[in-house]
Amino acid sequence: MRYALGVEYDGSEFQGWQQLGEHGGPSVQATLQAALSSVADAPIQVVCAGRTDAGVHGECQVVHFDSDARREPRGWMLGTTARLPPSVAVRWCVPAAEDFHARFSARARRYRYRLLNRQIRPALYRQTLSWERRPLDAQAMHTAAQALLGENDFGAFRSVQCQALHARRNLQAITVQRLGEVVEVQVQANAFLHHMVRNIVGSLILVGTGEQPIDWIATLLAGRDRTVAGPTAPPQGLVFIGPLYPAEWHLPAEVTQ
Protein backbone atom coordinates (compact mmCIF):
# COMPACT_ATOMS: atom_id res chain seq x y z
CA MET A 1 0.00 0.00 0.00
CA ARG A 2 1.18 3.52 -0.74
CA TYR A 3 1.23 6.31 1.85
CA ALA A 4 1.98 10.03 1.73
CA LEU A 5 3.66 11.83 4.62
CA GLY A 6 4.09 15.50 5.49
CA VAL A 7 7.50 15.97 7.10
CA GLU A 8 8.90 18.95 9.00
CA TYR A 9 12.62 19.29 9.70
CA ASP A 10 15.35 21.61 10.90
CA GLY A 11 18.09 21.13 8.33
CA SER A 12 20.89 22.56 10.47
CA GLU A 13 22.41 19.22 11.46
CA PHE A 14 21.97 17.49 8.10
CA GLN A 15 24.00 17.42 4.89
CA GLY A 16 20.77 17.91 3.00
CA TRP A 17 17.72 15.82 2.19
CA GLN A 18 19.29 13.25 -0.09
CA GLN A 19 21.09 10.19 1.16
CA LEU A 20 24.63 10.43 -0.22
CA GLY A 21 26.06 7.04 0.63
CA GLU A 22 27.80 5.55 3.63
CA HIS A 23 30.28 8.40 4.10
CA GLY A 24 28.13 11.30 2.93
CA GLY A 25 27.10 12.60 6.35
CA PRO A 26 23.65 12.58 7.97
CA SER A 27 20.69 13.19 5.68
CA VAL A 28 17.00 13.76 6.34
CA GLN A 29 16.13 10.98 3.90
CA ALA A 30 18.27 8.34 5.64
CA THR A 31 17.01 9.41 9.07
CA LEU A 32 13.37 9.19 8.00
CA GLN A 33 13.85 5.86 6.21
CA ALA A 34 15.46 4.34 9.31
CA ALA A 35 12.52 5.39 11.48
CA LEU A 36 9.91 4.16 8.98
CA SER A 37 11.76 0.86 8.55
CA SER A 38 11.70 0.37 12.31
CA VAL A 39 7.93 0.88 12.41
CA ALA A 40 7.39 -1.42 9.41
CA ASP A 41 9.95 -3.99 10.60
CA ALA A 42 11.12 -4.03 6.97
CA PRO A 43 13.24 -1.76 4.74
CA ILE A 44 11.41 1.37 3.55
CA GLN A 45 12.49 3.74 0.77
CA VAL A 46 10.92 7.18 0.39
CA VAL A 47 10.53 9.55 -2.57
CA CYS A 48 10.32 13.28 -1.84
CA ALA A 49 8.69 16.24 -3.57
CA GLY A 50 11.86 18.35 -3.63
CA ARG A 51 15.39 17.84 -2.35
CA THR A 52 16.90 20.46 -0.05
CA ASP A 53 20.58 21.32 0.48
CA ALA A 54 22.65 21.25 3.65
CA GLY A 55 21.30 23.67 6.25
CA VAL A 56 17.97 24.25 4.44
CA HIS A 57 14.78 23.49 6.38
CA GLY A 58 11.49 21.83 5.48
CA GLU A 59 8.08 23.01 6.70
CA CYS A 60 5.97 20.40 4.90
CA GLN A 61 8.11 18.19 2.72
CA VAL A 62 5.91 15.53 1.12
CA VAL A 63 7.13 11.98 0.60
CA HIS A 64 5.55 8.74 -0.50
CA PHE A 65 6.49 5.18 0.35
CA ASP A 66 5.12 1.67 -0.16
CA SER A 67 4.70 -0.91 2.58
CA ASP A 68 2.83 -4.17 3.20
CA ALA A 69 2.94 -3.59 6.96
CA ARG A 70 -0.51 -3.38 8.54
CA ARG A 71 -0.42 0.04 10.21
CA GLU A 72 -3.02 2.78 10.48
CA PRO A 73 -1.95 6.24 9.23
CA ARG A 74 -1.94 7.51 12.82
CA GLY A 75 0.35 4.64 13.77
CA TRP A 76 2.79 5.52 11.00
CA MET A 77 2.75 9.18 12.04
CA LEU A 78 3.20 8.70 15.79
CA GLY A 79 5.43 5.64 15.62
CA THR A 80 7.80 7.20 13.10
CA THR A 81 8.00 10.53 14.92
CA ALA A 82 8.81 8.70 18.18
CA ARG A 83 11.84 7.17 16.45
CA LEU A 84 13.08 10.42 14.90
CA PRO A 85 15.47 12.98 16.42
CA PRO A 86 13.94 16.23 17.76
CA SER A 87 14.85 17.99 14.51
CA VAL A 88 12.47 15.87 12.37
CA ALA A 89 8.74 15.18 12.77
CA VAL A 90 5.97 13.60 10.70
CA ARG A 91 3.07 16.06 10.64
CA TRP A 92 0.53 13.82 8.93
CA CYS A 93 0.13 10.53 7.12
CA VAL A 94 -2.61 9.58 4.66
CA PRO A 95 -3.21 6.62 2.33
CA ALA A 96 -2.30 7.53 -1.25
CA ALA A 97 -3.34 6.28 -4.65
CA GLU A 98 -1.00 3.70 -6.14
CA ASP A 99 -0.12 6.10 -8.98
CA PHE A 100 0.53 9.08 -6.69
CA HIS A 101 4.13 10.30 -6.89
CA ALA A 102 5.46 12.87 -4.42
CA ARG A 103 7.66 14.49 -7.07
CA PHE A 104 5.90 14.02 -10.39
CA SER A 105 2.34 14.58 -9.17
CA ALA A 106 3.23 18.01 -7.74
CA ARG A 107 1.94 21.03 -9.63
CA ALA A 108 4.17 23.58 -7.87
CA ARG A 109 6.71 24.05 -5.09
CA ARG A 110 7.07 26.91 -2.62
CA TYR A 111 10.01 28.37 -0.72
CA ARG A 112 10.41 31.11 1.88
CA TYR A 113 13.64 32.99 2.60
CA ARG A 114 14.01 35.18 5.71
CA LEU A 115 16.69 37.78 6.31
CA LEU A 116 17.21 39.49 9.65
CA ASN A 117 17.94 43.06 8.59
CA ARG A 118 19.66 44.87 11.45
CA GLN A 119 23.17 45.81 12.53
CA ILE A 120 23.52 43.03 15.12
CA ARG A 121 23.69 39.40 14.02
CA PRO A 122 21.06 36.96 15.34
CA ALA A 123 21.82 34.78 18.34
CA LEU A 124 18.51 33.09 19.16
CA TYR A 125 17.44 32.43 15.55
CA ARG A 126 20.86 32.08 13.92
CA GLN A 127 19.96 28.65 12.45
CA THR A 128 16.69 29.75 10.87
CA LEU A 129 17.43 33.29 9.69
CA SER A 130 20.04 34.72 7.40
CA TRP A 131 21.50 38.12 8.31
CA GLU A 132 22.11 41.31 6.37
CA ARG A 133 23.40 44.30 8.33
CA ARG A 134 22.99 46.84 5.50
CA PRO A 135 19.53 48.46 5.32
CA LEU A 136 17.33 46.82 2.68
CA ASP A 137 14.59 48.44 0.62
CA ALA A 138 12.06 45.59 0.53
CA GLN A 139 9.76 47.44 -1.88
CA ALA A 140 12.59 47.88 -4.40
CA MET A 141 13.40 44.19 -4.06
CA HIS A 142 9.76 43.24 -4.63
CA THR A 143 9.46 45.46 -7.70
CA ALA A 144 12.68 44.06 -9.18
CA ALA A 145 11.60 40.48 -8.53
CA GLN A 146 8.47 40.79 -10.67
CA ALA A 147 10.69 40.64 -13.77
CA LEU A 148 11.24 36.96 -12.99
CA LEU A 149 7.59 35.95 -13.34
CA GLY A 150 6.57 33.54 -16.05
CA GLU A 151 8.40 30.83 -17.97
CA ASN A 152 12.02 31.86 -18.46
CA ASP A 153 15.54 30.54 -18.76
CA PHE A 154 16.98 30.98 -15.25
CA GLY A 155 20.57 30.29 -16.25
CA ALA A 156 21.75 33.36 -14.32
CA PHE A 157 20.39 31.83 -11.12
CA ARG A 158 21.41 28.18 -11.39
CA SER A 159 24.33 26.61 -9.57
CA VAL A 160 27.36 25.58 -11.60
CA GLN A 161 26.79 22.09 -10.15
CA CYS A 162 23.18 22.01 -11.38
CA GLN A 163 22.48 18.79 -13.29
CA ALA A 164 19.13 19.82 -14.80
CA LEU A 165 18.89 19.26 -18.54
CA HIS A 166 17.77 22.85 -19.11
CA ALA A 167 17.22 26.04 -17.11
CA ARG A 168 13.64 26.84 -18.15
CA ARG A 169 11.25 27.09 -15.22
CA ASN A 170 7.85 28.69 -14.71
CA LEU A 171 8.03 31.10 -11.78
CA GLN A 172 4.41 31.57 -10.74
CA ALA A 173 4.70 34.03 -7.84
CA ILE A 174 7.36 35.97 -5.95
CA THR A 175 6.88 38.49 -3.15
CA VAL A 176 9.23 40.47 -0.93
CA GLN A 177 7.93 42.13 2.20
CA ARG A 178 9.28 43.62 5.41
CA LEU A 179 7.99 42.19 8.69
CA GLY A 180 9.63 44.35 11.33
CA GLU A 181 13.35 43.57 11.28
CA VAL A 182 12.83 40.63 8.91
CA VAL A 183 12.72 40.81 5.11
CA GLU A 184 10.84 37.81 3.74
CA VAL A 185 10.96 36.48 0.18
CA GLN A 186 8.37 33.90 -0.93
CA VAL A 187 8.65 32.10 -4.25
CA GLN A 188 6.44 29.60 -6.07
CA ALA A 189 7.36 27.77 -9.29
CA ASN A 190 6.60 24.56 -11.09
CA ALA A 191 10.12 23.42 -10.20
CA PHE A 192 13.44 24.93 -9.13
CA LEU A 193 17.05 24.67 -10.24
CA HIS A 194 19.88 23.89 -7.82
CA HIS A 195 20.46 26.98 -5.60
CA MET A 196 17.92 28.93 -7.68
CA VAL A 197 16.10 30.57 -4.76
CA ARG A 198 19.30 31.41 -2.88
CA ASN A 199 20.85 32.89 -6.02
CA ILE A 200 17.76 35.01 -6.68
CA VAL A 201 17.82 36.26 -3.09
CA GLY A 202 21.54 37.03 -3.32
CA SER A 203 20.89 39.24 -6.33
CA LEU A 204 17.82 40.88 -4.80
CA ILE A 205 19.88 41.86 -1.77
CA LEU A 206 22.12 43.96 -4.02
CA VAL A 207 19.01 45.75 -5.29
CA GLY A 208 17.80 46.21 -1.72
CA THR A 209 21.05 47.85 -0.63
CA GLY A 210 21.00 50.18 -3.64
CA GLU A 211 24.17 48.72 -5.15
CA GLN A 212 22.21 47.72 -8.23
CA PRO A 213 19.17 49.33 -9.90
CA ILE A 214 15.73 47.76 -9.94
CA ASP A 215 16.00 46.76 -13.62
CA TRP A 216 19.23 44.82 -12.94
CA ILE A 217 17.28 41.63 -12.18
CA ALA A 218 15.63 41.78 -15.61
CA THR A 219 19.06 42.32 -17.17
CA LEU A 220 20.46 39.28 -15.36
CA LEU A 221 17.54 37.13 -16.46
CA ALA A 222 18.00 38.13 -20.10
CA GLY A 223 21.77 37.62 -19.96
CA ARG A 224 21.60 34.11 -18.44
CA ASP A 225 25.15 34.51 -17.06
CA ARG A 226 25.62 33.24 -13.51
CA THR A 227 29.03 34.91 -13.17
CA VAL A 228 27.61 38.45 -13.22
CA ALA A 229 24.71 37.82 -10.82
CA GLY A 230 24.79 38.22 -7.05
CA PRO A 231 26.32 35.74 -4.59
CA THR A 232 24.46 32.71 -3.29
CA ALA A 233 22.57 33.61 -0.12
CA PRO A 234 23.35 31.42 2.95
CA PRO A 235 21.25 28.27 3.44
CA GLN A 236 19.91 28.81 6.95
CA GLY A 237 17.36 31.44 5.90
CA LEU A 238 15.68 29.09 3.41
CA VAL A 239 12.63 26.94 4.14
CA PHE A 240 10.95 24.56 1.70
CA ILE A 241 7.32 25.41 2.50
CA GLY A 242 6.18 22.41 0.50
CA PRO A 243 4.68 21.28 -2.80
CA LEU A 244 1.17 21.80 -4.15
CA TYR A 245 -0.93 19.00 -5.67
CA PRO A 246 -4.24 18.86 -7.57
CA ALA A 247 -7.27 18.15 -5.39
CA GLU A 248 -7.74 14.75 -7.07
CA TRP A 249 -5.01 13.27 -4.84
CA HIS A 250 -7.03 14.00 -1.67
CA LEU A 251 -4.09 15.27 0.37
CA PRO A 252 -4.28 17.73 3.30
CA ALA A 253 -5.34 21.28 2.44
CA GLU A 254 -1.91 22.81 3.07
CA VAL A 255 -0.46 20.94 0.07
CA THR A 256 -3.51 21.09 -2.22
CA GLN A 257 -3.94 23.72 -4.93
UniProtKB/Swiss-Prot annotation:
Binding site residues for substrate: Y111
First-tier enzyme category under EC: isomerase
EC number(s) stated in the UniProt entry for this protein: 5.4.99.12
Residue numbers annotated as active site: D53
Catalytic activity, as annotated: uridine(38/39/40) in tRNA = pseudouridine(38/39/40) in tRNA
CDD domains to which the protein is assigned, alphabetical: PseudoU_synth_EcTruA
Pfam family, one: PseudoU_synth_1
The entry's keywords: Isomerase, tRNA processing
Record-linked SUPFAM superfamilies: Pseudouridine synthase
Functional note: Formation of pseudouridine at positions 38, 39 and 40 in the anticodon stem and loop of transfer RNAs.
Quaternary assembly: Homodimer.
NCBIfam families xrefs: hisT_truA (TIGR00071)
Official protein name in the record: tRNA pseudouridine synthase A
Biological source species: Xanthomonas campestris pv. campestris (strain ATCC 33913 / DSM 3586 / NCPPB 528 / LMG 568 / P 25)
